[in-house]
Design a protein with these regions (language model features):
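Predominantly late transmembrane helices and immediately cytosolic-facing juxtamembrane segments
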Residues: 2-23, 27, 35, 44, ...
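Loop-to-transmembrane alpha-helix initiation sites
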Residues: 166-169, 358-367
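Short hydrophobic/alpha-helical segments at membrane-entry points of transmembrane helices
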Residues: 109-113, 171, 361
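Short, amphipathic C-terminal "tail helix"
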Residues: 353, 367-377
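Acidic, carboxylate-rich catalytic segments that either coordinate divalent cations
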Residues: 400-401
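Alpha-helical transmembrane segments of multi-pass membrane proteins
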Residues: 32-42, 357
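Membrane-helix boundary connector in multi-pass membrane proteins
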Residues: 330-334, 349-362
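Extracellular/periplasmic helix-loop-helix junction of adjacent transmembrane segments
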Residues: 45-50, 54
Length: 401
């Protein structure tokens, strides 16, 4: 009996994570998510209506929850060890099929989407069961919480594949509700995570989303490259760079340190759930909506945007900023009035953006974001310096912003 135990222990320890550094396989896995994001943008671009935007965001929400589950998983399991690597490759293949079926996920490829999505989620649970076999608290969370919500969500998406219209939309909505409501219903106790690794994974996925906005510029400019297209491309890069700055200059640093300081267990898990699993979705969704707006702007520089597209470009950026406001409230319990006011102004400008030439609307967006960054950098220069260069002063720096 003892010999069996001594041989089992090394096999288990070989797949448990020992380092906070993001591994190459995790980055490789995220490349599939790049395609999935691109496909969500393509779905909305093919149907530039309010319904099309709703479908794209619903798919993005479902894909995000699958990805977020793997972010939690790889805080426990080393994806590059043992059979875990092979299961991760299989999950990548399933995720790729999901991404390929996204553009027609509500029609001809609905059943394929549901089956492939189910495979992604099953692989996720299988690896968590492996990692939790000597951890009763984690195993209980996996079986009762994750297993239950996953079964309901996947089952509803499968049922939705057999329907259409309002019933299909309702089934999708309930599936999303089960996924996102599960962690609140079953609680955050029992889960494990490595704070620095977890924060870094989400920062990298936001970079991937921002990369999609750059790709959208290139796709939208696939034609005659005249002066208007060049100016629009430069403004598009400026907007994407501004969104990068707003997150990575200070916010990401403070949030990562705050998560690392949280007491391991329930406090840290709830903070990770709220700040990263939940609040990074509207950030990513905002960037995806912006990418849609950039693509259409580059295609029609001198024309006005459709109302839904204007709302996507300015409203998506506003969503990104509002997510930052909520992110800060959850992390350091203070309110950022400057980003909130900028988001509100962008929402008010949507009707104007729908009648102006697309290039003018993009210029207004770039100008407002630039003014916001300059204001914060000048007004809070000392606090910014403490956060970026003096970690000991970080705790008092962010709340003053």
């Amino acid at each position: 009996m003892s010999s069996v135990e001594t041989t089992r222990a090394p096999r288990l320890s070989a797949v448990l994570r020992q380092t906070e550094q993001v591994t190459p396989l995790e980055l490789f896995f995220d490349l599939v998510f790049v395609l999935a994001i691109t496909q969500c943008t393509a779905l909305m671009a093919a149907e530039p209506t309010w319904t099309g935007l709703g479908k794209g965001l619903a798919v993005l929400g479902l894909l995000w929850w699958a990805w977020a589950g793997y972010a939690w998983l790889t805080s426990v399991v080393d994806p590059e060890e043992g059979a875990v690597r092979l299961v991760m490759f299989a999950a990548m293949a399933a995720f790729l099929v999901v991404a390929l079926s996204v553009p027609d996920a509500f029609d001809q490829t609905a059943f394929l989407f549901a089956c492939a999505y189910g495979a992604v989620r099953v692989a996720h649970i299988a690896l968590f069961l492996l990692a939790s076999r000597d951890d009763p608290a984690l195993r209980n969370s996996v079986i009762v919480g994750l297993g239950g919500s996953t079964a309901l969500s996947v089952g509803l998406i499968g049922a939705a594949a057999l329907t259409d219209g309002l019933l299909q939309g309702a089934l999708w909505a309930v599936a999303l509700l089960f996924d996102f409501g599960g962690p609140f219903l079953f609680g955050a106790e029992g889960w494990k995570l490595l704070a620095e690794h977890f924060a870094e994974r989400h920062a990298l996925i936001l970079i991937i989303a921002l990369g999609e906005s750059i790709v959208a510029i290139g796709i939208g400019a696939d034609g005659v490259v005249d002066a208007g297209v060049v100016v629009a491309a430069i403004l598009g890069v400026a907007v994407s760079a501004a969104l990068w700055w707003l997150y990575f200059d200070v916010v990401a640093i403070v949030a990562k340190r705050r998560l690392a300081r949280a007491a391991p267990g329930r406090e840290q898990n709830e903070l990770a759930r709220d700040s990263y699993s939940y609040l990074h979705l509207p950030m990513v969704a905002g960037v995806v909506l912006l990418a849609l707006g950039l693509k259409k702007t580059l295609e029609h520089v001198g024309e006005s945007l459709d109302p839904a597209i204007a709302a996507a470009m300015l409203g998506g950026t506003a969503l990104y900023l509002l997510a930052h406001v909520a992110f800060r409230l959850r992390n350091v319990h203070t309110f950022n009035p400057h980003r909130f006011a900028t988001a509100a102004l962008l929402l008010l400008l949507i009707p104007l953006a729908a009648v102006l030439p697309a290039l003018a609307a993009l210029a207004i967006l770039a100008a407002l974001l630039t003014l916001l960054i300059v204001y914060e950098a000048v007004r809070f220069a000392e606090a910014r310096d403490r956060v970026r260069h003096h970690p000991a002063g970080e705790a008092t720096a962010e709340p003053t912003r």
